């Protein structure tokens, strides 16, 4: 039988890089790892709560974290950074920084947050998954949503994209899995620059699971 594996971990060190860059002593490793997860969750929740737009949730592609002795450097790769500055939200980054600092266990460390714009947002599966989730929450038919998402990705000149949605689609009583693909997506080729994300979305019919694979070459 085939063995399923996370496409990012499968290619780590070949075409994918780590998103946390630091070293820690053995007794502190698990603590720092949990702290990284808390930082990412805090950032994602802040963006979804404060800068949700009509077409996306702000578009976070990924969050990279670097640590020094008393400094934590966070770089947020975001598809639509202007949403942090419009509608009187000029202090959005500073408020986000304060929220993260309040969440951290130690108050004597410094935190630096940098924002970097993603040139082609819909080449990133996380941003595309947020778009799909928003459409499903609005009860847009899932097939129409998948085709539109593939069109958005193809406009960004991706080599291939595969989308899978699982759950009670269109409110049907029996859960099922549906997928669509555009271009080629060689999942078993380690050298293929495939980006991937899994994104759950809560609907009135239950939780739907969205999986997206994008070949960036």
Curated annotation (Swiss-Prot):
Primary subcellular site in the record, as a coarse category: plastid
Disulfide partners: none
Record keywords, A-Z: Chloroplast, Plastid, Ribonucleoprotein, Ribosomal protein, RNA-binding, rRNA-binding
InterPro entries: KH_dom-like_a/b (IPR015946), KH_dom_type_2 (IPR004044), KH_sf_prok-type (IPR009019), Ribosomal_S3_C_sf (IPR036419), Ribosomal_uS3_bac-typ (IPR005704), Ribosomal_uS3_C (IPR001351), Ribosomal_uS3_CS (IPR018280)
PROSITE patterns referenced in this protein's UniProt entry, alphabetically: KH_TYPE_2 (PS50823), RIBOSOMAL_S3 (PS00548)
KH type-2 domain sequence ranges: 47-119
GO MF, one annotated term: structural constituent of ribosome
Location relative to the cell: Plastid, Chloroplast
Signal peptide coordinates: none
Domain of life: Eukaryota
One of the GO BP terms on file: translation
GO cellular component: chloroplast; cytosolic small ribosomal subunit
Subunit structure, interactors included: Part of the 30S ribosomal subunit.
UniProt-listed HAMAP family: Ribosomal_uS3_B
Family: Belongs to the universal ribosomal protein uS3 family.
NCBIfam families per record: rpsC_bact
Protein name: Small ribosomal subunit protein uS3c
Lineage: Eukaryota, Viridiplantae, Streptophyta, Embryophyta, Tracheophyta
């Amino acid at each position: 039988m085939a063995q399923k594996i996370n496409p990012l971990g499968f290619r780590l060190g070949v075409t994918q890089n780590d998103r946390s860059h630091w070293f820690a002593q053995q007794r502190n490793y698990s603590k720092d790892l949990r702290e990284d997860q808390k930082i990412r969750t805090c950032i994602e929740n802040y963006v979804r709560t404060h800068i949700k737009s009509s077409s996306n949730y702000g578009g976070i592609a990924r969050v990279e974290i670097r640590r020094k002795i008393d400094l934590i450097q966070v770089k947020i790769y975001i598809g639509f950074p202007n949403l942090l500055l419009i509608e009187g939200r000029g202090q959005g980054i500073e408020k986000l920084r304060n929220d993260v600092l309040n969440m951290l266990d130690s108050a004597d460390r410094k935190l630096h947050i940098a924002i970097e714009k993603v040139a082609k947002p819909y080449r990133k599966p996380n941003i595309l998954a947020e778009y799909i989730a928003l459409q499903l929450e609005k009860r847009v038919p899932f097939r129409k949503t998948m085709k539109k998402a593939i069109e958005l990705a193809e406009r960004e000149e991706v080599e291939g994209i595969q989308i899978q949605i699982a759950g009670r689609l269109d409110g049907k009583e029996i859960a099922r899995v549906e997928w669509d693909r555009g271009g080629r997506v060689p999942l078993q080729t380690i050298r293929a620059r495939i980006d991937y994300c899994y994104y759950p979305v809560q609907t009135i019919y239950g939780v739907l699971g969205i999986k997206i694979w994008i070949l960036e070459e």
